[in-house]
Swiss-Prot record:
Name assigned to this protein: Zinc finger protein 668
Lineage start: Eukaryota, Metazoa, Chordata, Craniata, Vertebrata
Domain of life (superkingdom): Eukaryota
Cross-link (Glycyl lysine isopeptide (Lys-Gly) (interchain with G-Cter in SUMO2)): 57, 59, 65, 80, 154, 512
Bias kind Basic and acidic residues: ranges: 54-71
Family according to the record: Belongs to the krueppel C2H2-type zinc-finger protein family.
N-acetylmethionine PTM sites in chain numbering: 1
Alphabetic keyword roster: Acetylation, DNA-binding, Isopeptide bond, Metal-binding, Nucleus, Phosphoprotein, Repeat, Transcription, Transcription regulation, Ubl conjugation, Zinc, Zinc-finger
Listed GO MF terms: DNA binding; zinc ion binding
C2H2-type Zn finger ranges: 22-44, 84-106, 112-134, 140-162, 168-190, 196-218, 224-246, 252-274, 280-302, 308-330, 336-358, 364-386, 392-414, 516-538, 544-566, 572-594
Amino acid sequence: MEVESPEERSPAPGYKRSGRRYKCLSCTKTFPNAPRAARHAATHGLADCTEEMAEAKLKPETDPKAEDASGDKVSGAAAKPRPYACPLCPKAYKTAPELRSHGRSHTGEKPFPCPECGRRFMQPVCLRVHLASHAGELPFRCAHCPKAYGALSKLKIHQRGHTGERPYTCADCGKSFADPSVFRKHRRTHAGLRPYSCERCGKAYAELKDLRNHERSHTGERPFLCSECGKSFSRSSSLTCHQRIHAAQKPYRCPACGKGFTQLSSYQSHERTHSGEKPFLCPRCGRMFSDPSSFRRHQRAHEGVKPYRCEKCGKDFRQPADLAMHRRVHTGDRPFKCLQCDKTFVASWDLKRHALVHSGQRPFRCEECGRAFAERASLTKHSRVHSGERPFHCNACGKSFVVSSSLRKHERTHRSSEATGAPPQQELVVGLALPVSMAGEGPAAPASGAALGDPPAGLLGLPSESGGVMATQWQVVGMTVEHVECQDAGVGEAPGPLGAAGEVGGEEVDEKPPQFVCRECKETFSTLTLLRRHERSHPELRPFHCTQCGKSFSDRAGLRKHSRTHSSVRPYTCPHCPKAFLSASDLRKHERTHPVPIGTPTPLEPLVALLGMPEEGPA
């Protein structure tokens, strides 16, 4: 092939001639001839940009006699007119064929099909590159992973994922990109060009293909099928990432801990766990996030938007992944199986959490009391016992809670009162009945509405070594009191604010709890939870049957636990003795029978610190 000299062709816009080479004014790279300079210009978006964008790339000292890529004269900052303007975006073109070619990016038209596999393309040059993959012509191979490409430009973009190079920086928000096409798409978001809107949820997109991908989250269409396991996906990129799992490919590896990842975005989010960086700030509550997906999910919680609806039961969800997981409840699909006990799970993280039960690993340790946890979320909840943080607030009454599940339970009291027309129930938190020697010591306990909305972890049914009586549970009744201290004699009696039954501070309480009636037997219950639990006792509401003995259960988990009695599988082994158990709850009960080593913090210590009560010293 004959190489053209710089005199035979003029440089592309944004370039100046330096001797016999062409220098890019955007990134200072140099090229020996005009064709290579023109190809590089496309990576900066100069091949099909408007006059205004081209002028921004041209420096004042650009040669006024320079010509653009098509051979047209460029005089100073003015270029040849572009009479063919796109009606959907600010781009303009010199010829009608160029405009028609550009219009396919808006319409999604792909008139060039591949004769081998049927895949279609918008431009003939894209088809030619694709055909090289069928012919096995992939001469450009990555040195870091087994991936190969038919074009050098594709390889260079791919290699930036390994090196972390992101040469395309947005002037408006500072975000940087490795792929010029992704950069151009991002620029449209600042221009506000989102002409394609979803008819179901109103979400708008800059390109038609993005709208098509989004619509599959509503329809449930998953046209991309994995040939290894049969799993289907709504996006081709998701299938590509999934196939790396079968090939054991993790091209993105963390230099700090050595952990590998199949996706660049997952690797970048992981890096922030080492640096502690949380760049995504919620403007409503000030909470910060390390990855954009968690941030978007959190924002939907504020907005209350749940655009993804189950077609079988009508339940709405914020994320398409949540809807896909919910559908498994209807289909009974539990694809994640434990290799040690054959237990199956709906979600992969449920399996990972369950695996810690067998391994006994508790890698997350509290710096205050030394207690260890299998999950980071459990440690986060536990740390609030020490800090007193209660981040979950009720919008109806202002009460705050340590964990979100307690807030949801509390909110049901407001919803049930609205359904029955009765005034909302107020929650009574009966304080822990401390040993007699501790009763009355220390400062007064805080009001129930501000302090002890939830029992701290590990404080249910604690025995008292000194003979005092401790409450076995936290109770909810239809009244509010300051604090209750149970004495050694007469657990049912409570001095102070709580007097005789039905009286609070000497005043009678005549509020009746709401009544919930069973449809089958007309029995009444004080809470909706008790009613639902009772309804499962009816035979017609116990749909899960044991095939060996015929016993029926109200949920699938109960049937799985029961089936182990037939198979003699006891997957939960005590780390202190050879005993094994059918369920994790039975194992936890058994572990309490083993003596606690001296020096191990007791579960009572965090509560004592929270209440501000002095610990008993030696007599």
